[in-house]
């Protein structure tokens, strides 16, 4: 029994460490190995999938060298890589450290699977624990925080993982006698194989939907009648705590089998469908309940199957774990590559959920009565431990809601004679060195009164699952209005020191562009007078200027302003001599950056193109126009002072 408890603890801690590495590795692929929207998505996907294909050899290594030695060595490499990443090396060092940590983590999973036939409790606690930690940190990982807090907590996590792994290995019972490497009965089932197959899909569904604190936040600020289809500052961690409660309750406590076979798979499928249709709150709640229940279903089946503690059974579980992680990689690449290649991607989360549901139901239907010597069907953890874990993690998730209070709406003041405006494509908060450095972004925007942001990420798992908008708004002390573009958690935003009274969004027609785009209009109260602001990020069709989208934005902006002073800006992906640029000037708008032309903003390390722009309505004048050199993004920000009439 103690061995089971230690193995469960070691697995939970290892999952948390592996998720930390994945939160660095995924964005490193698209910022360091290549650049999203520049490097072919096929090449990025091939590089990412290659590591998971390489890990398919891990079960053979485990079978030949033994799960104990391989598991401990892999755990050591995983822990060392995780700790080294806390130094935030950036550049190639970050990429290859993360790759080494990922591969070690995949080998470690195969080794653990060889000796742990019932992983559901460990997987559930690891997923929930990592999510709660992410929420407590405001979605900014320890790896990116650094400093005394980052190093001390990282060292504590890594030390606990290594200690639990070492002690669990020492107390692990020997493999079952009587069934050797080569004479295992071919008809004998392998306990835990299906449960391990769910490891990878569960990691994805939890990190992308069910247990994603950034997604909780993004969903919390919606629903205002003055801002239809938009999001304001909101704290979604409290309802997120309910998702943690649902997930752990269904994963650690079994419902009646006949009921569970129907309710949990249906809940999981419904949650995935709601996610791809943009209904985020019911999506993550249903996915959390369904995912936990499906893990419990697979675990119950593993408990009832015949014993197979030999080397061959361990290898089968290891292969299942490796295949499950390959599913994780394929589904992740398939979902996010669509934003570069332009195909529908809603099927990816739904297909992943369907796979989990089918495996869980199939496993429960194949369960047989326990036989002498079979693994006990009792829960892996005693009731007191399960209740304590459920209550403790749920309470900590609720505590996170009090630690990260979003900025409140600014008060109206005396009408200013001028406002300081900035427009910045922040590339999800990642700098040229591949590090998430929102402090650097905030430094570039400090002192601005109105900020127009492009490529704002509020929870993409591909980027590590951060709410970059909330983190940046907290640093600047500025409320925001967010408009979805590519999907509900990726788009454009306006931050302002002045109160935002209302807002609108207009989805732009794709015209062949693979990534979604929109135009966000926000009305600001400047103390007795109003300023209309429009933020957008035009997406050019392959090989063409975004003329049609520029025309749509210009028409929307003119109509939205309705005679009020107007500022329009963002990453427009067009040069001053291009037809799309002329759509704005032809609509009567004035190039606010003209006094400083040429003002090249991209790429940030060698600016050659003028694609980030700000336009104003006639009567407004611009001065102090700058594009300061910085590596905080792959674009340079543009800043200017706009004098009001």
Which residues does each predicted region cover?
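Membrane-interface segments at or immediately adjacent to transmembrane helices
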Residues: 392-471
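Active-site metal-binding loops of divalent metal-dependent hydrolases
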Residues: 426, 456, 537-538, 570-572
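Active-site environment of divalent metal-dependent phosphoester hydrolases
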Residues: 429-431, 458-462, 487-489, 541-543, ...
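Stable alpha-helical elements in mature extracytoplasmic
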Residues: 434-437, 441, 465-468, 472, ...
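Sec-exported extracytoplasmic/periplasmic mature domains
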Residues: 446, 450, 473-477, 500, ...
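His/acidic metal-ligating clusters that form di-metal
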Residues: 521-525, 532-534, 546-572, 580-584
């Amino acid at each position: 029994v103690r061995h089971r408890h230690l193995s469960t603890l070691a697995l939970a801690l290892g999952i948390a460490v592996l998720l930390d590495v994945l939160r660095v590795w995924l964005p490193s692929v698209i910022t360091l190995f290549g650049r999203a929207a520049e490097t072919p998505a096929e090449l990025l996907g091939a590089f990412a999938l290659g590591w998971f294909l390489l890990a398919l050899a891990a079960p053979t290594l485990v079978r030949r060298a033994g799960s104990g030695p391989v598991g401990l060595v892999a755990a050591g490499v995983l822990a060392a890589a995780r700790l080294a990443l806390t130094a935030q090396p950036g550049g190639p060092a970050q990429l290859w450290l993360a790759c080494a940590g990922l591969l070690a983590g995949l080998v470690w999973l195969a080794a653990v699977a060889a000796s742990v036939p019932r992983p559901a409790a460990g997987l559930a606690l690891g997923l929930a624990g990592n999510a709660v930690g992410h929420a407590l940190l405001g979605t900014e990982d320890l790896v990116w925080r650094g400093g005394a807090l980052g190093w001390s907590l990282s060292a504590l996590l890594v030390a606990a993982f290594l200690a639990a792994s070492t002690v669990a290995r020492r107390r692990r019972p020997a493999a079952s006698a009587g069934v050797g490497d080569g004479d295992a009965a071919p008809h004998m089932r392998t306990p835990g194989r299906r449960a391990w197959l769910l490891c990878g899909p569960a990691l994805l569904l939890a990190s992308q939907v069910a247990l994603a604190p950034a997604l909780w936040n993004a969903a919390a600020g919606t629903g205002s009648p003055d801002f239809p289809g938009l999001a304001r500052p909101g704290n979604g961690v409290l309802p997120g705590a309910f998702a943690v409660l649902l997930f752990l309750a269904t994963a650690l406590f079994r419902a009646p089998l006949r009921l569970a076979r129907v309710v949990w798979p249906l809940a999981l499928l419904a949650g995935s469908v709601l996610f791809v249709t943009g209904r985020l709150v019911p999506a993550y709640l249903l996915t959390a309940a369904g995912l936990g229940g499906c893990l419990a279903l697979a675990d119950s089946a593993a408990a009832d199957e015949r014993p197979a503690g030999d080397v061959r059974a361990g290898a089968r579980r290891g292969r299942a774990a490796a295949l499950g992680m390959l599913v994780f990689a394929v589904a992740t690449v398939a979902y996010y590559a669509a934003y570069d290649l332009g195909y529908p991607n809603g099927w990816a989360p739904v297909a992943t959920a369907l796979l989990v549901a089918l495996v869980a139901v199939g496993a429960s239907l194949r369960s047989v009565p326990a036989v002498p010597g079979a693994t006990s069907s009792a829960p892996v953890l005693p009731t007191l431990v399960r209740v304590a874990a459920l209550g403790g993690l749920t309470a900590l998730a609720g505590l996170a809601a009090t630690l990260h209070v979003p900025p409140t709406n600014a008060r109206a003041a005396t009408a200013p004679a001028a406002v300081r405006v900035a427009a910045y494509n922040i590339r999800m908060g990642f700098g040229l060195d591949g590090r998430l450095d929102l402090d650097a972004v905030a430094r570039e925007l400090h002192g601005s009164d109105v900020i127009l942001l492009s490529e704002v990420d509020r929870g993409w798992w591909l980027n590590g699952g951060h709410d970059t908008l909330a983190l940046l708004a907290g640093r600047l002390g500025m409320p925001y209005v967010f408009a979805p573009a590519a999907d509900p958690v990726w788009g454009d935003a306006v931050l302002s020191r002045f109160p935002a009274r209302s807002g609108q969004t207009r989805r732009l027609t794709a015209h062949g562009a693979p990534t979604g785009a929109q135009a966000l209009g926000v009305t600001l109260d400047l103390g007795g007078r109003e300023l209309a602001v429009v933020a957008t990020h035009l997406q050019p069709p392959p090989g063409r200027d975004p003329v049609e989208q520029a025309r749509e934005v210009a028409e929307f902006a003119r109509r939205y302003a309705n005679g009020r002073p107007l500022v329009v800006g963002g990453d427009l992906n067009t040069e001053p001599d291009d037809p799309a640029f002329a759509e704005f000037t032809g609509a009567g708008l004035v190039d606010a950056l003209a006094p400083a032309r040429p003002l090249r903003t991209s790429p940030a390390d060698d600016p050659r193109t003028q694609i980030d722009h700000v336009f104003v309505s006639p009567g407004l004048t611009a001065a102090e126009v700058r594009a300061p050199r910085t590596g905080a993004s792959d674009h340079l920000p543009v800043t200017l002072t706009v004098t009001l009439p």
